[in-house]
Amino acid sequence: MERDEPPPSGGGGGGGSAGFLEPPAALPPPPRNGFCQDELAELDPGTISVSDDRAEQRTCLICGDRATGLHYGIISCEGCKGFFKRSICNKRVYRCSRDKNCVMSRKQRNRCQYCRLLKCLQMGMNRKAIREDGMPGGRNKSIGPVQISEEEIERIMSGQEFEEEANHWSNHGDSDHSSPGNRASESNQPSPGSTLSSSRSVELNGFMAFREQYMGMSVPPHYQYIPHLFSYSGHSPLLPQQARSLDPQSYSLIHQLLSAEDLEPLGTPMLIEDGYAVTQAELFALLCRLADELLFRQIAWIKKLPFFCELSIKDYTCLLSSTWQELILLSSLTVYSKQIFGELADVTAKYSPSDEELHRFSDEGMEVIERLIYLYHKFHQLKVSNEEYACMKAINFLNQDIRGLTSASQLEQLNKRYWYICQDFTEYKYTHQPNRFPDLMMCLPEIRYIAGKMVNVPLEQLPLLFKVVLHSCKTSVGKE
């Protein structure tokens, strides 16, 4: 049976897989590092309810009805939760008699099942949270909505995805442990919404393989490319209309995160005299020095985290080796963006790639360029505050799905706490931007995807990649 009743409000009943939820109404007093040590009540990771007083402040992202909690990754009502589960478990294929853009509301949601399922997928409902047997207990505890390409959505809506999954299972039997609603990708690269696995871990002493990973930035206006980041419906507000206040404990935890950050300008020299022609080798060496400094700052950051004493050194090593590229990319897009897109862009402008470099540039590099340009544009529009950056960084770092962790459940609770705190802060600070929090969170899986794709970009192509990205970003911002 699915857990439909909201847990008791207060102390330990507000946990779960997290998402666009509120934290418990009143958190217990924090211990020495600002975190409570209590075990939160175990909830069905596929669907999490919230207390009545909190739920009244939310509306379903699918139909606008009263939301009862986080279901399969997004805030939704009981009706849409059940509809999505039945559709995926029963592999239903619907048809729309109109233009596939039917209005979704509480009164009209049953008129077109096709458009209802389509919106569930577009808003990020997570099929991996549905067990193949339909019982409670999600197969994947990834927090928040997932990103699905338009092509994959079309395969699901047409039934092609279900047919491929059936064929896959018939060929592989029980050796494949993925849910029939969520066939694991056979590609060597993670999908945009996938979690980082140990196969992508990079040894700390080998960060020269920084090659692949980082520094997202970019933006030309002619780029209409949107890499599957979903825009949330304007008529499905996430926030209550009344003014809110920020909980003192949330403020304290955010302050602790900010205290752990090194927000001083980067020390790597990036100034160069006019007229000097930068070579490929010189630019690559500069990129490596930047990666060195940024990585060092991430290591120092970990040691200052308020929950540092609560996790083992083994877990921290595992987390850092699996996420450091993403942390560097996130920081480059936010707190260090002025230097990266200013001073570094000026250096890359003095580098002229050869015809051979241009000719040999890979398709993987082109995809990374396009995604970085879009992501930079997204961050530039959002104007992420230091507080939001600190929370996003902690959320991304505390990835309980990484293999080899000894305290995955504790990581999940820490992740959820900062997820809720970030949501509280954005709702308090940006009351007129109801979609701001989901917009921020949807950037994280894209950062992971870009970091993974950069692994396939040859080292010698990085100088050209950064030149194109930084030039595009700086040029487009200058025109605004």
Curated annotation (Swiss-Prot):
Zn(2+) 1 binds at residues 60, 63, 77, 80. Residues 165-177 have a biased composition (Basic and acidic residues). Its main location: nucleus. GO terms for molecular function: DNA binding; DNA-binding transcription activator activity, RNA polymerase II-specific; DNA-binding transcription factor activity, RNA polymerase II-specific; DNA-binding transcription repressor activity; estrogen response element binding; nuclear receptor activity; protein homodimerization activity; sequence-specific DNA binding. Residues 57-132 bind DNA. A zinc finger (NR C4-type) spans 60-80, 96-120. InterPro entries: NHR-like_dom_sf, Nucl_hrmn_rcpt_lig-bd, Nuclear_hormone_rcpt_NR3, Nuclear_hrmn_rcpt, Znf_hrmn_rcpt, Znf_NHR/GATA. It holds the Pfam family zf-C4. Coiled coil: none annotated. One of its GO terms (cellular component) is chromatin. PROSITE patterns: NR_LBD (PS51843), NUCLEAR_REC_DBD_1 (PS00031), NUCLEAR_REC_DBD_2 (PS51030). One of its GO terms (biological process) is negative regulation of transcription by RNA polymerase II. Keywords: DNA-binding, Metal-binding, Nucleus, Receptor, Transcription, Transcription regulation, Zinc, Zinc-finger. Residues 172-253 are annotated as: Sufficient for interaction with UIMC1. Zn(2+) 2 binds at residues 96, 102, 112, 115. Shows highest expression in the germ cells of the adult testis. PANTHER family: KNIRPS-RELATED PROTEIN-RELATED (PTHR48092). Homodimer. Interacts with UIMC1. This is Nuclear receptor subfamily 6 group A member 1. It comes from Homo sapiens (Human).
